[in-house]
Swiss-Prot record:
Top-level taxonomy: Eukaryota, Metazoa, Chordata, Craniata, Vertebrata
Record key words, sorted: Glycoprotein, Golgi apparatus, Membrane, Signal, Transmembrane, Transmembrane helix
Subcellular localization: Golgi apparatus, cis-Golgi network membrane; Golgi apparatus, trans-Golgi network membrane; Golgi apparatus membrane
Gene: GPR108
Family per record: Belongs to the LU7TM family.
GO BP field: negative regulation of toll-like receptor signaling pathway; regulation of immune response
Membrane topology listed for this record: Multi-pass membrane protein
Protein name: Protein GPR108
The protein's role, per its UniProt record: May play a role in intracellular immune modulation by activating NF-kappaB response and attenuating Toll-like-receptor response.
Transmembrane segments: 268-288, 297-317, 341-361, 372-392, 406-426, 454-474, 478-498
Ranges where the record places region Disordered: 165-190
InterPro entries: GOST_TM, GPR107/GPR108-like
């Protein structure tokens, strides 16, 4: 997403989050679907600028305000640089992700929809080559007016029509006789390549600039499009030359600035926020009716549900303003970041505490469980903060893809590590069921822990793995099903967890150990932690249970 300045956000942010969180929030903000990318000393051969799903009458505007190449203009051969616009089956699949690193996308032909913008620094022109069947994909120089009479459709398409000799071959374009051709589609040659268009290239102070816009004219051209920049001279190892680039990208659909897959997200997040709010209110009503069996962990579960609801509410509002204005409200965006961070921390803390049996079965965590909390929770908080920072940066940044993959791996590691307290509790109950006289109670608790273990496993698979596979295979306009699956799985996990561990007298998980059993657990915990000296055992009766 785009980078924009945030003015005055530091004063309005809560002080308890500390300077590091403020720094991460201030590193970059989202300005919606109006992207501005500035790279200095860049050496990559391929830069993935953006991916967007277009409907009919959707428009893409690109303004290359600065391109300064490392090669000197005195060289005989002009550098091979330019843009490529490719339609792909899924937004998560890049057009050149599996290609040879030494192959230049600007030199290849394609039977699928592909548009190349070849920058010729010698002749100061940009050659536009179109491949595939493109009946109504309109390309014109310049940017669209701010308030067109018809959204997405330009009044005319200024292009240069090449000469065609009697043999049927295409000759060089004649700039002197070029004229607008209106909104008529281009004629396709015998070779399958459309006739070339030529755009002007500006040259000022050893830098180049030009702008163009693309309009999706029919349903046949709808789809997910990837816009990339290529510097083919840097594809050869050891011959990289640094270059500077500043580009502005503005994408729009007839209904707003959101991509095709993001248009339903405003309503989706609003509905899911209401569902989590209703679940939280229902959970609090259960806690108020069963005060005798309520523990602190129950109120922590309620706080998690309400925080999730507020986070989705702010997320929904952000998408609404992005769709209508092209950028979110800065204050609401920061509130979404804060609630998103709180939600991620509370989620893993709650899962780990329930799995370890804290407050339900025991009141002291062992050294192993403390290490899990000391490692997993800070990593998960860091991963959530890092995801927020990545969302506020441009996709074309040099470290964007690498950090996104690393952070996804860290999140999976955290999800796997958080299962250890549940496994340890299951093993403890298995050992206890054969050593003490409370076999029935321990077996009931063991069955409940096994169910919870399966629930956590399913939650991780549905929200981390299956959801990503779904996004990779569904059509571009249905990719919002990824968010639906994630939020639906989260809601189902919350409801099942509340049902399994609700405050009820007949819940085996809430049957605190009495005398002998509790003494054995406290003795084991104190032995593992090394704080046994100076402690005396106190008997607990049913009347001594914690009341909230």
């Amino acid at each position: 997403m785009a980078v924009s300045e945030r003015r005055g956000l530091g004063r309005g942010s809560p002080a308890e989050w500390g300077p590091w969180l403020l720094l991460l929030l201030l590193l970059g903000g989202s300005s919606g679907r109006i992207h501005r990318l500035t790279l200095t000393g860049e050496k990559r051969a391929d830069i993935q600028l953006n991916s967007f799903g277009f409907y009919t009458n959707g428009s893409l505007e690109v303004n290359l305000s600065l391109l300064r190449l490392g090669r000197q203009d005195t060289e005989e051969k002009a550098p091979l640089v330019g843009f490529s616009l490719t339609r792909v089956r899924s937004g998560s699949i890049r057009s050149y992700s599996n290609r040879d690193s030494h192959e230049c996308p600007l030199r290849k032909n394609s039977s699928s929809l592909l548009v190349l913008f070849l920058i010729n620094t010698k002749d100061l022109e940009v050659q536009v080559r179109k491949y595939g069947e493109q009946k109504k994909l309109f390309i014109s120089a310049g940017l669209l007016p701010e308030s067109p009479s018809k959204p997405g459709l330009p009044k005319s398409e200024h292009m240069v029509t090449p000469k065609v000799d009697h043999a049927g071959t295409t000759a060089a374009p004649d700039k002197a006789k070029s004229k607008p051709t209106g909104l008529q589609g281009d004629r396709q040659g015998v070779s399958g390549k459309d006739q070339e268009l030529v755009l002007g290239l500006g040259h000022l102070n050893n830098s180049y600039n030009f702008s163009f816009h693309v309009v999706i004219g029919s349903r046949a051209e709808e789809g997910q499009y990837n816009l990339n920049f290529h510097n083919c001279d840097n594809s050869v190892p050891g011959r990289e030359q640094p270059f500077d680039i500043t580009v502005m990208i503005r994408e729009k659909n007839p209904e707003g600035y959101l991509s095709a897959a993001e248009i339903p997200l405003f309503k989706l997040y609003m509905v899911m926020s209401a569902c989590f709010l209703g679940a939280g209110i229902f959970w609090v009503s259960i806690l108020c009716k069963n005060t005798y069996n309520v523990f602190k962990i129950h109120w922590l579960m309620a706080a998690l549900t309400f925080t999730k609801s507020v986070s989705l509410l702010f997320h929904s509002i952000n998408y609404y303003f992005i769709n209508s204005q092209g950028h979110p409200i800065e204050g609401l965006a920061v509130m979404h970041y804060i609630t998103h961070l709180l939600k991620g921390a509370l989620l893993f803390i709650t899962i780990a505490l329930i799995g370890s049996g804290w407050a339900f079965v025991k009141y002291v965590l062992s050294d192993k469980e403390k290490k899990i909390f000391g490692i997993v929770i800070p990593l998960q908080v860091l991963a959530n903060v890092a995801y927020i920072v990545m969302e506020s940066r441009e996709e074309g940044a040099s470290d964007y893809g690498i950090w996104k993959e690393i952070l996804f791996l860290v999140d999976l590691i955290c999800c796997g590590t958080i299962l250890f307290p549940v496994v340890w509790s299951i093993r403890h109950l298995q050992d206890a069921s054969g050593t003490d006289g409370k076999v029935a109670v321990n077996l009931a608790k063991l069955k409940l822990f096994r169910h919870y273990y399966v629930m956590v496993i399913c939650y991780i698979y549905f929200t981390r793995i299956i959801a990503i596979l779904l996004r990779a295979v569904v059509p571009f306009q249905w990719q919002w099903l990824y968010q639906l699956l994630v939020e639906g799985s989260t809601l189902a996990f919350f409801v099942l967890t509340g049902y399994k561990f609700q405050p009820a007298r007949d819940n085996p998980y809430l049957q605190l150990p009495q005398e002998d059993e509790e003494g054995m657990q406290i003795e084991q915990v104190m032995t593992d932690s090394g704080f046994r000296e100076g402690l005396s055992k106190v008997n607990k009766t049913a009347s001594g249970r914690e009341l909230l």
